[in-house]
Amino acid sequence: MQHSNFVHLHLHTQYSLLDGAIRPEALIALALEYRMPAVAMTDHGNIFGAVDFYQKAMARGIKPIIGCEVYVAPGSRSDRNTPSRGEAAFHLVLLVKNQKGYQNLCKLLTKAYLEGFYYRPRVDKELLKEMNEGLIALSACLHGEVSYNIGLGQMDSALKAAAEYKEIFPDRRFFIELQHNGLAEQEKVNKGLIEVSRALDIPVVATNDCHYLKKEDARVHDILLCIQTGNTVNTPNRMKFATDELYVKSPQEMCEAFKDIPEAISNTIEIAERCNFEMKLGEHHLPEFPVPPGETLDSLI
């Protein structure tokens, strides 16, 4: 069976707590229907669902791509002086290529919770420079550092941020993420993202930042946001998404949306083919304790 020419690489399941409304089993069934050879899971700040997602995808013959949309502190992860919650962290999508990448993602998230927690579990560029091997990075949504600066009209800052990420993730491991999601701001930012891509020779990739399975699930997701923020659907001026297009679009829909920049579609397949992590389950991996000269483990106990 010929597979589709597009794969979703930015997607939030129910493990994006009170934000994602996609159940892994339903996602995998839809990926099969769309003939996708692979699909990613990139929940906010955690990989709580990694084992569940991996097992269910493998059982149905779909390649699971483990990932995470991490929060990146604008400065140091130890800094607690950012003026507001909205400026406390940028978004960055990390996808696991191999065993080393999975180990590094686990280490990054552990550090984020233990050392960088401020509203959200945050990493910083110091950690990314140290623990990037085996990971592919995508520039994320409008809350990504590059997109955020473009939205403010600060093109120089956007170029600087993109150049930093390209240096941190060399060998074609950093991609500029483009989305067509019905948001006017996104369309404006896309133009700037393409400029950044061409100026710095950074490849682009198409995503949809999926938060729910089908378009009609947008209202259910809106109720989930109300629970998250302690509001009701009738609360004025509450937080809500200004689009109903953050669903798992078909390959045909994505190809049509990006017909003017087809490499953004083909690059999803390239990335999927480069991600080949095999999760070894049912094995015991005990920690190694260094033993001083002249000692044994028994003598130390």
Question: What kind of feature is each model-predicted range?
Answer:
Residues 1-301:
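Phosphodiester-processing cores and adjacent nucleic acid-binding clamps
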